[in-house]
Each structure stands twice: as C-alpha cells, then as structure tokens.
Amino acid sequence: MSCTPVSTKCNDIWIDFSCTGPSVSELQKKEPNAWAAILRSQKNQQTAEDDTIIGSICDKQGLCSKDEYAYSQYCACVNSGTLWAECAFAPCNGNKNAYKTTEQRNILTNKQCPSGLTICQNIAEYGGTGNISDLYQNFNCNSVINTFLINVMNHPFLTLILIILILVIIYRLMSSSAAKQNGDKLPPPSLIFSNLNNF
C-alpha cells in the first residue's frame, strides 16, 4: 500500500504515520540496502552510512525522501518532526520497523530522554490558511489528552495582537500591585496615552 504524501515540508509535525506503506517484502525487493539499514537499526548497529541510505524529507535524499515511503512506518522517526520522537512519539519508539538514526540510538542507549515526556500516539489535525502555517496541531496524547500547539509567529498581525495582550496583562498586574502598596489607583491607560499626546 502506498502512502500518499499530504505535505513534503521539512519537519511537518502533522502526520501520525498510521499508513504502513509498502510491505516488508516489497521493501526487501525494491530497497534492499534500506531494509538492511533498518535491520541494523533494530540491533542498534546502524552507521552514518545507514543514516544516509534512509535519509529524510529534510535531507532530500534516501529512502524517506521518496513519496511512497516518506510517511510510512519506516520513516516515523526521521520524518516526524516531533521533538524527541525516539523518546515520546509512539509511531517511532513503538515500532521496530521505524529506522532510528545513529543520533537517536545514542540518545536512547545513553538514557538521555527528558523525564516527564507525554507520549503522543497520533497527530489528528494540521492546518493553516493563507500565509499562516502550522496554525493548529491537535496531538492525541496518551489516548486522552488533546494538546493544541499554536504558532502565530508566521503572521505579523497575530504576533502584534499577542504582544499587545501581554503588555496589557503586565500593565494590569503592575497597576494592581502599585495600588495595593500606595493605597490609591493609577490612572487608566487611556488617560496616560492622552497625556502623552500633549507632549
């Protein structure tokens, strides 16, 4: 079964890798070097050469840069875009056929995974319109918790709104603490800004 790529953007975090991709027997016939690399990965014997053979979308080379394999089970570690995929992304760390790079192997063997990571099994949604990308990502973590990650930094208007909201919150916190200390209230922001216009 072929996995049709929805996106070929480097480090997209939308995919759940539920598509198994070409069967193991197909992979053995079509890509014997890649299958040998996966077998070495299963035994923690992968090499830098194996990393190159498997590749990734970001590398633009190797097995995992090809459309039919990019979102298959074999590429769930190298193409997931998930931080610490080898530690906390079930399609990667829970799948023996998912190739782990030498760097990922070293993190696992040296027990360098951060503590308290939430295991995310599926990524259910990915979206964005216009020039806003990665606007929402719905992670189904531990089959219970939905975590929404919002990236507004790709859109200047949304970034400006976020900065204004932060400044308003800071002003309110400062004015309430100053009022408690002095026993009187600071003037409202509108009065302050109107006085600034008089200068």
From Swiss-Prot:
Keywords (A to Z) from UniProt: Glycoprotein, Host membrane, Late protein, Membrane, Transmembrane, Transmembrane helix, Virion
GO cellular component term of the entry, any: virion membrane
Record's function text: Essential for viral fusion with host endosomal membrane and core release. Not required for virus morphogenesis and egress. Induces complete autophagy through the interaction with and down-regulation of host PYCR2.
Compartment(s): Virion membrane; Host membrane
Quaternary structure (record): Interacts with host PYCR2; this interaction results in autophagy activation.
Protein name, as recorded: Inner membrane protein E199L
Similarity field: Belongs to the asfivirus E199L family.
Annotated glycosylation sites: N131
Induction: Expressed in the late phase of the viral replicative cycle.
Topology versus the membrane: Single-pass membrane protein
Main location: virion
Transmembrane stretches, start-end: 150-170
